[in-house]
Amino acid sequence: MNIRPLHDRVIVERQEVESKSAGGIVLTGSAAEKSTRGVVLAVGKGRILENGTVQPLDVKVGDTVIFAESYGTKTEKIDGKEVLIMSENDIMAIVD
C-alpha cells in the first residue's frame, strides 16, 4: 500500500529500543518504554500559511528524528508495519 501524508504531516516508523536496564535486567510490559525515535518514511508537501503559500517541511525522508507523542499522533498498520502519523510540530529534533 502506498500512503502519502497531506500538508505538514509526517509518517514515522518507530525505532526499537533496548529492552534491558542499565544493570542488564530485561524489561517487559509497562517497564519497557516505547522509543521516541524513528525514521521518516514520508512527508507532506508543507504547511499552508495564512497568505496561502506553502512552507516546505524541515524533515526529509530517511531522517532519524526524536518526537513527542501527543494527542494528535495517530498509529496505523501499513503493510504489516506499525507507523506513526504526526504533525511536523511533534518532531523535536533531527538526529545526525
Curated annotation (Swiss-Prot):
- Which InterPro entries does the protein's record reference? Chaperonin_GroES, Chaperonin_GroES_sf, Chaprnonin_Cpn10_CS, GroES-like_sf
- Where would you find this protein in the cell? Cytoplasm
Which key words tag this protein in UniProt?
Chaperone, Cytoplasm
Leader sequence range is none
Gene Ontology CC, one term = cytoplasm
Q: What is its main location?
A: cytoplasm
Q: Which GO terms describe its biological process?
A: chaperone cofactor-dependent protein refolding
Keyword Chaperone among record annotations: yes
Q: Which GO terms describe its molecular function?
A: ATP binding; metal ion binding; protein folding chaperone; protein-folding chaperone binding; unfolded protein binding
Q: Classify the source by domain of life.
A: Bacteria
Q: Which Pfam families match?
A: Cpn10
Q: Which residues form a coiled coil?
A: none
- Fill in the subunit field for this protein: Heptamer of 7 subunits arranged in a ring. Interacts with the chaperonin GroEL.
Protein family according to the UniProt entry = Belongs to the GroES chaperonin family.
Q: Main role?
A: Together with the chaperonin GroEL, plays an essential role in assisting protein folding. The GroEL-GroES system forms a nano-cage that allows encapsulation of the non-native substrate proteins and provides a physical environment optimized to promote and accelerate protein folding. GroES binds to the apical surface of the GroEL ring, thereby capping the opening of the GroEL channel.
Q: In its UniProt entry, what is this protein called?
A: Co-chaperonin GroES 1
Give the gene name: groES1
